[in-house]
Regions:
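N-terminal, positively charged nucleic-acid-binding surface of large information/translation enzymes
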Residues: 1-172
């Protein structure tokens, strides 16, 4: 029996899926396709006017690259938001970042070896702002690469002027 005869006796499913994943090659095209189809806004449009489900994002600090804890956190939130969207809820999801406090200050002092005591408060705050924005951009890119569907164009950042005033107004 030749090899070709034997192959004809095996009943394998027919599929368009490639035999090799080739993720490094295919990932940019997948991400571009999801971006081009505006997946987040399409999901919102589909359920516009229906009951609302809001998941408030407890934000990560913007003081380093994403790690497994961030990945698990965002994957679970994405799963919850998508499952509510599939159940017919309007599900806006606004990602955010916490940019205040010691985690940012400690990270920038350590990483850039800053002598913050020799700097003016304004210069140190500006350096912290730039440092935080760098890691927001990196983390956002990582979350997008994970396929997290969110309003990436309008995230909240605790370092933005007016953020705290806006939160105070919401609580009234």
């Amino acid at each position: 029996m030749s090899k070709n005869d034997f192959n004809a006796t095996i009943n394998l499913p027919k599929t368009d899926f490639p035999m090799r994943a080739g993720l490094a090659k295919r990932e940019p095209d997948m991400l571009r396709r999801w971006n081009d189809m505006d997946l987040y806004n399409e999901m919102l449009k589909k359920n516009d006017g229906k009951p609302r489900f809001s998941l408030h994002d407890g934000p990560p600090f913007s003081n380093g690259n994403i790690h497994m804890g961030h990945a698990l956190n965002k994957a679970l939130k994405d799963f919850i938001v998508r499952s509510y969207a599939m159940r017919g809820y309007y599900t806006p999801y606004i990602p955010g970042w916490d940019n205040h406090g010691m985690p940012i200050e400690s990270a920038i002092i350590k990483e850039q070896k800053l002598n913050h005591k020799a700097m003016s408060i304004a210069d140190f705050r500006s350096a912290c702002h730039d440092y935080a924005q760098k890691y927001i951009d990196r983390q956002m890119d990582g979350f997008k690469r994970m396929g997290v569907v969110a309003d990436w164009e309008h995230p909240y950042k605790t370092m933005n002027k007016g953020f705290e005033a806006d939160r105070s107004e919401e609580r009234r």
